[in-house]
A protein has these predicted regions:
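Bacterial N-terminal signal peptides that target proteins for export
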Residues: 1-11
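N-terminal signal peptide c-region/cleavage motif recognized by signal peptidases
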Residues: 18-20
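Juxtamembrane/interfacial segments around transmembrane helices
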Residues: 407-408
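Short, linear, compositionally biased motifs with a strong N-terminal bias
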Residues: 13-16, 196
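His-enriched metal-coordination microenvironments in redox/metal-binding proteins
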Residues: 130-398, 402, 411-421
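Aromatic- and Gly/Pro-enriched helix-to-coil junctions and flexible linker segments
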Residues: 23-161, 165, 169, 179-180, ...
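Amphipathic, positively biased hydrophobic alpha-helical segments used for protein targeting
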Residues: 11-13, 121, 238, 364
Length: 421
Protein backbone atom coordinates (compact mmCIF):
# COMPACT_ATOMS: atom_id res chain seq x y z
CA UNK A 1 0.00 0.00 0.00
CA UNK A 2 1.43 3.43 -0.90
CA UNK A 3 2.47 5.44 2.15
CA UNK A 4 0.26 8.39 1.16
CA UNK A 5 -2.82 6.16 1.14
CA UNK A 6 -1.81 4.65 4.49
CA UNK A 7 -1.53 8.09 6.07
CA UNK A 8 -4.96 9.03 4.72
CA UNK A 9 -6.51 5.89 6.19
CA UNK A 10 -4.85 6.51 9.56
CA UNK A 11 -6.10 10.10 9.59
CA UNK A 12 -9.61 8.94 8.75
CA UNK A 13 -9.54 6.34 11.50
CA UNK A 14 -8.37 8.92 14.02
CA UNK A 15 -11.16 11.29 13.04
CA UNK A 16 -13.72 8.53 13.66
CA UNK A 17 -12.60 7.93 17.24
CA UNK A 18 -15.25 9.34 19.61
CA UNK A 19 -14.13 12.37 21.56
CA UNK A 20 -14.94 10.54 24.78
CA UNK A 21 -12.38 7.89 23.89
CA UNK A 22 -9.59 10.44 23.72
CA UNK A 23 -7.96 12.42 26.54
CA UNK A 24 -10.27 14.26 28.92
CA UNK A 25 -11.86 17.25 27.24
CA UNK A 26 -11.21 20.47 29.15
CA UNK A 27 -12.35 24.04 28.83
CA UNK A 28 -8.93 25.62 28.57
CA UNK A 29 -7.49 23.27 25.97
CA UNK A 30 -10.50 22.19 23.91
CA UNK A 31 -13.59 24.33 24.45
CA UNK A 32 -12.18 27.86 24.79
CA UNK A 33 -10.77 27.86 21.22
CA UNK A 34 -14.21 26.89 19.89
CA UNK A 35 -15.91 29.67 21.84
CA UNK A 36 -13.32 32.18 20.66
CA UNK A 37 -13.77 31.24 17.02
CA UNK A 38 -17.55 30.92 16.92
CA UNK A 39 -19.24 32.53 19.93
CA UNK A 40 -17.40 35.36 21.62
CA UNK A 41 -18.04 37.95 18.93
CA UNK A 42 -21.54 38.15 20.48
CA UNK A 43 -21.01 36.54 23.90
CA UNK A 44 -18.97 39.26 25.58
CA UNK A 45 -19.78 42.26 27.76
CA UNK A 46 -21.86 45.06 26.25
CA UNK A 47 -22.93 43.04 23.23
CA UNK A 48 -26.17 41.45 22.05
CA UNK A 49 -25.82 38.08 23.81
CA UNK A 50 -27.38 37.67 27.29
CA UNK A 51 -24.19 36.33 28.84
CA UNK A 52 -20.42 36.46 28.37
CA UNK A 53 -18.43 33.35 27.45
CA UNK A 54 -14.94 34.83 27.62
CA UNK A 55 -13.69 32.86 30.62
CA UNK A 56 -14.25 29.54 32.35
CA UNK A 57 -15.99 31.38 35.18
CA UNK A 58 -18.33 32.95 32.62
CA UNK A 59 -19.11 29.72 30.79
CA UNK A 60 -19.31 27.13 33.59
CA UNK A 61 -22.76 28.11 34.94
CA UNK A 62 -24.15 27.83 31.41
CA UNK A 63 -22.58 24.47 30.53
CA UNK A 64 -25.81 22.46 30.19
CA UNK A 65 -27.49 25.22 28.24
CA UNK A 66 -24.47 25.48 25.93
CA UNK A 67 -24.64 21.74 25.24
CA UNK A 68 -28.35 21.90 24.48
CA UNK A 69 -28.03 24.88 22.16
CA UNK A 70 -25.12 23.51 20.13
CA UNK A 71 -26.62 20.01 19.86
CA UNK A 72 -29.85 21.48 18.53
CA UNK A 73 -27.83 23.79 16.26
CA UNK A 74 -29.59 26.83 17.66
CA UNK A 75 -26.21 28.36 18.42
CA UNK A 76 -24.29 29.74 16.72
CA UNK A 77 -27.29 30.98 14.70
CA UNK A 78 -27.06 29.49 11.21
CA UNK A 79 -30.23 27.88 9.88
CA UNK A 80 -29.35 26.77 6.36
CA UNK A 81 -30.11 23.09 5.73
CA UNK A 82 -26.59 21.72 5.42
CA UNK A 83 -27.78 18.69 3.45
CA UNK A 84 -29.53 20.54 0.62
CA UNK A 85 -28.20 22.62 -2.24
CA UNK A 86 -25.18 24.90 -1.87
CA UNK A 87 -23.30 24.44 1.40
CA UNK A 88 -20.37 26.85 1.16
CA UNK A 89 -20.89 30.36 2.47
CA UNK A 90 -18.83 33.31 3.56
CA UNK A 91 -18.63 33.91 7.31
CA UNK A 92 -20.30 30.62 8.25
CA UNK A 93 -20.16 30.54 12.09
CA UNK A 94 -21.70 27.08 12.49
CA UNK A 95 -19.93 24.32 14.40
CA UNK A 96 -18.62 21.16 12.79
CA UNK A 97 -19.83 17.79 14.05
CA UNK A 98 -16.44 17.33 15.74
CA UNK A 99 -16.74 20.68 17.53
CA UNK A 100 -20.25 19.81 18.73
CA UNK A 101 -18.95 16.45 19.99
CA UNK A 102 -16.15 18.22 21.85
CA UNK A 103 -18.51 20.61 23.63
CA UNK A 104 -20.89 17.76 24.46
CA UNK A 105 -18.10 15.59 25.88
CA UNK A 106 -16.88 18.49 28.02
CA UNK A 107 -20.31 19.02 29.57
CA UNK A 108 -20.91 15.28 30.04
CA UNK A 109 -17.58 15.03 31.90
CA UNK A 110 -18.68 17.67 34.40
CA UNK A 111 -17.31 20.69 32.51
CA UNK A 112 -13.72 20.49 33.86
CA UNK A 113 -11.61 23.62 33.66
CA UNK A 114 -8.27 22.05 32.75
CA UNK A 115 -4.83 23.54 33.16
CA UNK A 116 -4.72 27.35 33.19
CA UNK A 117 -1.56 27.11 31.09
CA UNK A 118 -3.63 25.53 28.27
CA UNK A 119 -5.88 28.58 27.98
CA UNK A 120 -5.32 30.37 24.65
CA UNK A 121 -4.58 34.11 24.71
CA UNK A 122 -7.78 36.17 24.96
CA UNK A 123 -9.31 37.07 21.65
CA UNK A 124 -8.78 40.75 20.93
CA UNK A 125 -11.87 42.66 19.84
CA UNK A 126 -11.26 45.81 17.86
CA UNK A 127 -13.70 48.20 16.25
CA UNK A 128 -13.89 45.88 13.24
CA UNK A 129 -15.71 43.31 15.36
CA UNK A 130 -18.56 45.72 15.92
CA UNK A 131 -19.47 45.39 12.25
CA UNK A 132 -19.98 42.12 10.44
CA UNK A 133 -18.38 43.57 7.31
CA UNK A 134 -15.14 44.53 9.07
CA UNK A 135 -13.79 47.98 9.81
CA UNK A 136 -15.88 50.52 7.87
CA UNK A 137 -14.46 53.32 5.75
CA UNK A 138 -17.60 55.40 6.28
CA UNK A 139 -20.46 55.34 8.79
CA UNK A 140 -23.61 57.39 8.23
CA UNK A 141 -26.18 57.67 11.02
CA UNK A 142 -29.76 58.85 11.17
CA UNK A 143 -29.74 62.65 11.56
CA UNK A 144 -31.59 62.44 14.90
CA UNK A 145 -32.39 59.90 17.58
CA UNK A 146 -35.82 58.33 17.79
CA UNK A 147 -37.35 57.24 21.10
CA UNK A 148 -39.95 54.48 21.14
CA UNK A 149 -42.43 55.03 23.96
CA UNK A 150 -43.28 52.09 26.26
CA UNK A 151 -46.82 51.51 25.00
CA UNK A 152 -46.80 53.07 21.53
CA UNK A 153 -48.15 51.30 18.46
CA UNK A 154 -45.91 50.27 15.57
CA UNK A 155 -44.33 53.26 13.81
CA UNK A 156 -43.04 53.55 10.26
CA UNK A 157 -41.13 56.52 8.91
CA UNK A 158 -38.16 57.83 6.97
CA UNK A 159 -35.04 59.72 7.99
CA UNK A 160 -32.63 61.17 5.43
CA UNK A 161 -28.97 61.89 6.16
CA UNK A 162 -26.15 63.34 4.07
CA UNK A 163 -23.43 60.85 3.16
CA UNK A 164 -20.73 63.53 3.13
CA UNK A 165 -19.21 62.05 -0.02
CA UNK A 166 -17.61 64.57 -2.34
CA UNK A 167 -16.61 62.04 -5.01
CA UNK A 168 -18.05 58.88 -6.51
CA UNK A 169 -17.08 55.69 -4.67
CA UNK A 170 -17.82 52.00 -5.20
CA UNK A 171 -18.61 49.93 -2.14
CA UNK A 172 -17.58 46.31 -1.60
CA UNK A 173 -19.62 45.76 1.59
CA UNK A 174 -22.50 47.43 3.41
CA UNK A 175 -24.25 46.87 6.73
CA UNK A 176 -27.17 48.59 8.45
CA UNK A 177 -27.38 48.35 12.24
CA UNK A 178 -29.30 49.97 15.11
CA UNK A 179 -27.64 51.16 18.29
CA UNK A 180 -27.17 48.41 20.92
CA UNK A 181 -30.36 49.39 22.73
CA UNK A 182 -32.23 50.00 19.50
CA UNK A 183 -31.82 46.37 18.48
CA UNK A 184 -34.70 45.61 20.83
CA UNK A 185 -37.21 47.90 19.09
CA UNK A 186 -36.14 48.02 15.42
CA UNK A 187 -38.26 45.57 13.48
CA UNK A 188 -36.51 46.50 10.26
CA UNK A 189 -34.43 49.27 8.73
CA UNK A 190 -33.99 49.53 4.97
CA UNK A 191 -31.30 51.89 3.69
CA UNK A 192 -31.31 53.28 0.17
CA UNK A 193 -29.67 56.02 -1.88
CA UNK A 194 -31.38 59.33 -2.60
CA UNK A 195 -30.34 61.74 -5.34
CA UNK A 196 -32.12 65.09 -5.80
CA UNK A 197 -34.97 63.92 -3.56
CA UNK A 198 -35.63 60.90 -5.77
CA UNK A 199 -34.87 57.39 -4.42
CA UNK A 200 -33.39 56.38 -7.74
CA UNK A 201 -30.11 55.13 -6.37
CA UNK A 202 -31.53 51.80 -5.31
CA UNK A 203 -31.54 49.74 -2.13
CA UNK A 204 -28.35 49.50 -0.11
CA UNK A 205 -29.06 47.05 2.67
CA UNK A 206 -31.76 45.79 5.00
CA UNK A 207 -31.51 45.23 8.72
CA UNK A 208 -33.90 43.00 10.63
CA UNK A 209 -33.45 41.21 13.92
CA UNK A 210 -30.14 39.35 13.84
CA UNK A 211 -29.25 40.50 10.31
CA UNK A 212 -25.62 40.66 9.28
CA UNK A 213 -24.12 42.62 6.39
CA UNK A 214 -23.73 42.17 2.64
CA UNK A 215 -20.22 41.40 1.43
CA UNK A 216 -19.93 41.42 -2.35
CA UNK A 217 -17.66 39.12 -4.38
CA UNK A 218 -14.38 40.63 -5.50
CA UNK A 219 -14.87 42.62 -8.67
CA UNK A 220 -18.48 43.55 -7.92
CA UNK A 221 -20.02 46.36 -5.92
CA UNK A 222 -22.42 49.29 -5.79
CA UNK A 223 -21.86 52.91 -6.76
CA UNK A 224 -22.49 55.78 -4.37
CA UNK A 225 -22.31 59.07 -6.23
CA UNK A 226 -20.95 62.29 -4.80
CA UNK A 227 -23.57 64.19 -2.86
CA UNK A 228 -25.71 61.12 -2.26
CA UNK A 229 -28.00 61.06 0.71
CA UNK A 230 -29.08 58.00 2.66
CA UNK A 231 -32.70 57.17 3.35
CA UNK A 232 -33.42 55.17 6.52
CA UNK A 233 -36.83 53.52 6.18
CA UNK A 234 -37.60 52.52 9.77
CA UNK A 235 -40.14 50.29 11.48
CA UNK A 236 -40.20 50.47 15.28
CA UNK A 237 -42.27 48.49 17.78
CA UNK A 238 -42.68 49.01 21.53
CA UNK A 239 -41.44 46.60 24.21
CA UNK A 240 -42.89 48.15 27.37
CA UNK A 241 -40.07 50.53 28.19
CA UNK A 242 -38.66 53.65 26.51
CA UNK A 243 -35.85 52.84 24.07
CA UNK A 244 -33.85 55.34 22.02
CA UNK A 245 -32.27 54.40 18.71
CA UNK A 246 -30.08 56.02 16.09
CA UNK A 247 -29.53 53.45 13.34
CA UNK A 248 -26.40 53.68 11.17
CA UNK A 249 -25.20 52.24 7.88
CA UNK A 250 -21.53 51.36 7.33
CA UNK A 251 -19.57 51.01 4.10
CA UNK A 252 -16.32 49.40 3.03
CA UNK A 253 -15.00 51.04 -0.14
CA UNK A 254 -12.91 49.87 -3.03
CA UNK A 255 -9.78 52.02 -3.54
CA UNK A 256 -10.35 55.45 -5.03
CA UNK A 257 -10.62 55.34 -8.79
CA UNK A 258 -11.38 51.60 -8.87
CA UNK A 259 -14.45 50.58 -10.87
CA UNK A 260 -15.67 47.01 -10.32
CA UNK A 261 -16.58 45.00 -13.36
CA UNK A 262 -20.12 44.29 -12.15
CA UNK A 263 -22.76 46.29 -10.29
CA UNK A 264 -24.73 44.45 -7.60
CA UNK A 265 -28.53 44.48 -7.71
CA UNK A 266 -30.47 44.05 -4.47
CA UNK A 267 -34.10 43.05 -4.82
CA UNK A 268 -36.91 41.77 -2.65
CA UNK A 269 -38.89 38.87 -4.10
CA UNK A 270 -42.44 39.75 -5.18
CA UNK A 271 -45.07 40.41 -2.52
CA UNK A 272 -47.53 37.73 -1.55
CA UNK A 273 -50.25 40.25 -0.74
CA UNK A 274 -52.81 37.43 -0.66
CA UNK A 275 -50.95 35.56 2.10
CA UNK A 276 -53.57 33.50 3.94
CA UNK A 277 -52.53 31.73 7.15
CA UNK A 278 -55.53 30.20 8.95
CA UNK A 279 -55.62 30.03 12.74
CA UNK A 280 -53.92 26.88 14.00
CA UNK A 281 -52.52 25.85 10.60
CA UNK A 282 -49.00 24.47 10.92
CA UNK A 283 -47.72 24.14 7.33
CA UNK A 284 -49.09 26.87 5.05
CA UNK A 285 -47.26 27.17 1.73
CA UNK A 286 -46.85 30.21 -0.51
CA UNK A 287 -44.79 30.73 -3.68
CA UNK A 288 -43.11 33.62 -5.48
CA UNK A 289 -41.35 33.81 -8.86
CA UNK A 290 -38.88 36.17 -10.51
CA UNK A 291 -37.55 35.77 -14.07
CA UNK A 292 -34.02 36.75 -15.06
CA UNK A 293 -33.98 38.46 -18.45
CA UNK A 294 -30.19 38.18 -18.70
CA UNK A 295 -27.54 35.75 -17.40
CA UNK A 296 -26.71 36.44 -13.77
CA UNK A 297 -24.60 35.40 -10.80
CA UNK A 298 -26.51 35.13 -7.51
CA UNK A 299 -24.26 36.22 -4.65
CA UNK A 300 -26.49 36.11 -1.58
CA UNK A 301 -29.88 35.14 -0.21
CA UNK A 302 -31.87 36.04 2.90
CA UNK A 303 -35.36 34.81 3.75
CA UNK A 304 -37.73 37.26 5.42
CA UNK A 305 -40.82 36.25 7.38
CA UNK A 306 -42.20 37.18 10.78
CA UNK A 307 -43.16 35.14 13.85
CA UNK A 308 -45.06 32.44 11.97
CA UNK A 309 -42.22 31.81 9.52
CA UNK A 310 -41.22 28.14 9.43
CA UNK A 311 -39.02 27.45 6.40
CA UNK A 312 -38.11 28.73 2.96
CA UNK A 313 -36.43 27.17 -0.06
CA UNK A 314 -34.86 28.83 -3.08
CA UNK A 315 -34.64 27.03 -6.40
CA UNK A 316 -33.76 27.79 -10.00
CA UNK A 317 -36.10 26.70 -12.79
CA UNK A 318 -33.93 26.69 -15.90
CA UNK A 319 -35.15 27.46 -19.45
CA UNK A 320 -34.98 23.74 -20.30
CA UNK A 321 -37.37 23.17 -17.33
CA UNK A 322 -34.85 21.36 -15.16
CA UNK A 323 -34.91 22.45 -11.54
CA UNK A 324 -31.99 22.93 -9.14
CA UNK A 325 -32.40 23.40 -5.41
CA UNK A 326 -30.11 26.27 -4.41
CA UNK A 327 -30.70 26.74 -0.67
CA UNK A 328 -33.16 25.88 2.08
CA UNK A 329 -33.56 27.48 5.47
CA UNK A 330 -35.34 24.61 7.17
CA UNK A 331 -35.45 26.06 10.70
CA UNK A 332 -36.37 29.69 10.19
CA UNK A 333 -35.97 31.84 13.29
CA UNK A 334 -37.49 35.32 13.29
CA UNK A 335 -34.92 36.34 15.89
CA UNK A 336 -32.08 35.92 13.39
CA UNK A 337 -32.51 37.53 9.98
CA UNK A 338 -29.33 36.12 8.49
CA UNK A 339 -27.94 36.89 5.04
CA UNK A 340 -26.38 33.80 3.50
CA UNK A 341 -23.60 35.03 1.21
CA UNK A 342 -22.38 32.29 -1.12
CA UNK A 343 -18.67 31.51 -1.33
CA UNK A 344 -17.28 32.92 -4.57
CA UNK A 345 -16.53 29.52 -6.13
CA UNK A 346 -20.11 28.25 -5.71
CA UNK A 347 -22.24 31.31 -6.45
CA UNK A 348 -25.13 30.16 -8.67
CA UNK A 349 -24.56 30.90 -12.36
CA UNK A 350 -28.01 31.34 -13.89
CA UNK A 351 -28.70 31.59 -17.64
CA UNK A 352 -31.09 34.13 -19.12
CA UNK A 353 -34.68 33.02 -18.73
CA UNK A 354 -34.10 31.30 -15.39
CA UNK A 355 -37.02 31.62 -12.98
CA UNK A 356 -36.01 32.08 -9.35
CA UNK A 357 -38.65 30.35 -7.25
CA UNK A 358 -39.06 30.85 -3.51
CA UNK A 359 -41.29 28.50 -1.54
CA UNK A 360 -42.23 29.57 1.97
CA UNK A 361 -43.97 27.75 4.81
CA UNK A 362 -45.66 29.27 7.87
CA UNK A 363 -46.64 27.69 11.17
CA UNK A 364 -49.56 29.40 12.91
CA UNK A 365 -50.11 26.60 15.42
CA UNK A 366 -49.50 26.44 19.15
CA UNK A 367 -46.45 24.25 18.39
CA UNK A 368 -44.62 27.32 17.11
CA UNK A 369 -42.82 28.81 20.14
CA UNK A 370 -42.59 32.23 18.45
CA UNK A 371 -46.32 32.46 17.70
CA UNK A 372 -47.96 35.17 19.84
CA UNK A 373 -51.47 33.76 19.36
CA UNK A 374 -52.38 30.68 17.32
CA UNK A 375 -56.09 31.54 17.49
CA UNK A 376 -55.76 34.42 15.02
CA UNK A 377 -55.84 34.36 11.24
CA UNK A 378 -52.74 36.07 9.81
CA UNK A 379 -52.23 37.81 6.48
CA UNK A 380 -49.60 39.89 4.71
CA UNK A 381 -48.60 43.14 6.40
CA UNK A 382 -45.77 45.27 7.75
CA UNK A 383 -46.60 44.92 11.44
CA UNK A 384 -44.72 42.38 13.52
CA UNK A 385 -48.05 40.66 14.21
CA UNK A 386 -48.67 40.34 10.45
CA UNK A 387 -46.44 38.20 8.29
CA UNK A 388 -44.54 38.05 5.02
CA UNK A 389 -43.12 35.47 2.65
CA UNK A 390 -40.28 37.26 0.92
CA UNK A 391 -36.59 36.88 0.16
CA UNK A 392 -33.77 39.37 -0.34
CA UNK A 393 -31.58 38.51 -3.32
CA UNK A 394 -28.21 39.98 -4.31
CA UNK A 395 -27.07 39.34 -7.88
CA UNK A 396 -25.36 40.91 -10.85
CA UNK A 397 -25.92 40.49 -14.56
CA UNK A 398 -23.40 38.98 -16.95
CA UNK A 399 -22.97 39.30 -20.68
CA UNK A 400 -23.48 36.12 -22.69
CA UNK A 401 -19.71 35.87 -23.17
CA UNK A 402 -19.01 36.35 -19.45
CA UNK A 403 -21.59 33.75 -18.51
CA UNK A 404 -20.17 31.18 -20.91
CA UNK A 405 -16.62 31.82 -19.70
CA UNK A 406 -17.68 31.56 -16.03
CA UNK A 407 -19.44 28.24 -16.62
CA UNK A 408 -16.47 26.84 -18.54
CA UNK A 409 -14.04 27.96 -15.81
CA UNK A 410 -16.14 26.33 -13.09
CA UNK A 411 -16.49 23.09 -15.04
CA UNK A 412 -12.73 23.01 -15.61
CA UNK A 413 -12.13 23.51 -11.89
CA UNK A 414 -14.49 20.67 -11.04
CA UNK A 415 -12.73 18.37 -13.51
CA UNK A 416 -9.40 19.28 -11.93
CA UNK A 417 -10.65 18.53 -8.43
CA UNK A 418 -12.17 15.24 -9.56
CA UNK A 419 -8.89 14.11 -11.08
CA UNK A 420 -7.11 14.71 -7.75
CA UNK A 421 -9.38 12.41 -5.76
Amino acid sequence: MPMSRLFKLLALAAAMIPVSALAEVTFTRDVAPILQAHCQVCHRPDNIAPMSLLTYQDARPWARSIKQQVMQRNMPPWFIDQHVGIRKFKDDPSLSEQEIATVTAWVDAGAPQGKPSDMPPPRQFEDADKWHIGKPDLIVSMPVEYTVKPASSDWWGNFIADSGLTEDRYIKAVETKPTPGGIRVVHHAVTSLVYNDRPEGGTLNEYAVGKNGDIYPEGSGKLIKAGARIRFNMHYHAIGQPITDRTSVAFVFYPKGYQPQHVINTMLSPNNDDLDIPAGADNVRSDAYFKLEKPARLTGYQPHMHNRGKAQCLEAIYPNMTVEQLSCVNRYNFGWQIAYNYADDVTPLLPAGTIIHTTTWHDNSSKNPFNPDSRNWVGFGNRTTDDMSRAWLNFYYLSDEEFKAAVEARNAKQRELSSQR
